[in-house]
Amino acid sequence: LGDSLGLSQEAGKTDARIIVFCGVHFMAETAAIISPDKKILIPALGAGCSLAESITGYELREWKKANPDGIIVSYVNTTAEVKAWTDICCTSANALKVVQSIPPDRKILFVPDKNLGAWIRKVTGREMELWHGDCCVHERITTDMILEKSRDYPQADILIHPESHCSHDEAILNLPQAYMYSTAGMIRHASRSDKKQFIIA
């Protein structure tokens, strides 16, 4: 049990030669990249992800042609083809540090998650070109939904993933009980907190 990269890393640590990856296609690809000597099986070959499917390697190649000095930063939730055209691959946990490490005179294309990119841009003030991709589930999590749940459960901590539509809205970010986390960070917070209720965005 874990997030996409965490599961792929666990696959790399095990002595098993065959890994059955119960997830979407890009996750199994990532496991295969990390463990090229192992056989990675996915039960449903057609299991897709709207975020990963929002961009292709061809589109990145064309951007690179037009911006030869630009830096492509891709979220780990991408296909192997997209990773191949990527300069730096990041996770939601280290995306801020990755963007901050790039010289200010270099143009950045952040792909494919527009919400994660918008949150990074808001926090760092760094101008970036954002791809217009999203997770179809996270995109439906709006500020109004979270504020309503917060009124219903006033004692609950709000744990926000930067993929969520509400992740770069001041109305949420300014709440004292709101925390921005990767999936693994959410799990850690919930396990260590004295709170009994959590709103997950």
Residue positions per predicted region:
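Active-site loop-to-helix "anion-binding N-cap" substructures in soluble metabolic enzymes
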Residues: 1-201
